Amino acid sequence: MHKYLEVNAGGGLVTNAKGEFLLIRRSGLWDLPKGHQEPGENIGITALREVEEETGLKELTLGEFICVTDHTYFRNERWHLKHTWWYRMTCQGNGCDTVPQTEEGITEVRWVEKAELAEFLQQTYPTIVEVFRSIGLSEKFLPSVKQNS
């Protein structure tokens, strides 16, 4: 059995005035911005800070808590268990201009219309689809689940 290093993170599901969703591209997959909580930091503040750092967005407004997702990964010769607290966020006007944080491996930041989401979410992690499902987004906007024959 692995002994996991537990990590807390905050992330954001950001929308703009047009109702578009913000996605980032990292390691060849579409993702939502998120990052590690600093010692003593409120997790909502973590989510805001990380979204701003990874996307260049300004004047974000923190909205309601969505859900917590968990995933594991192997880095620096040990297993990590990351708990991510997800929040809705909004931005307005020029505060919605984006700049990818390339030093974190983010190659693109893109605003995506709801009708296009399923296409983008075919290339993401299952936990990211769960965040969208948690806000009650209709299944027609999510990637179809392939059944094993």
Task: Give the role of each language-model region.
Residues 26-27:
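C-terminal lobe/hinge of AMP-binding adenylation domains
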Residues 37-126:
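Unchanged
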Residues 1-11:
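Acidic, metal-coordinating catalytic segment for phosphate/diphosphate chemistry
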Residues 124-149:
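Charged phosphate-binding loop/patch that engages nucleotide di/tri-phosphates or the phosphate backbone
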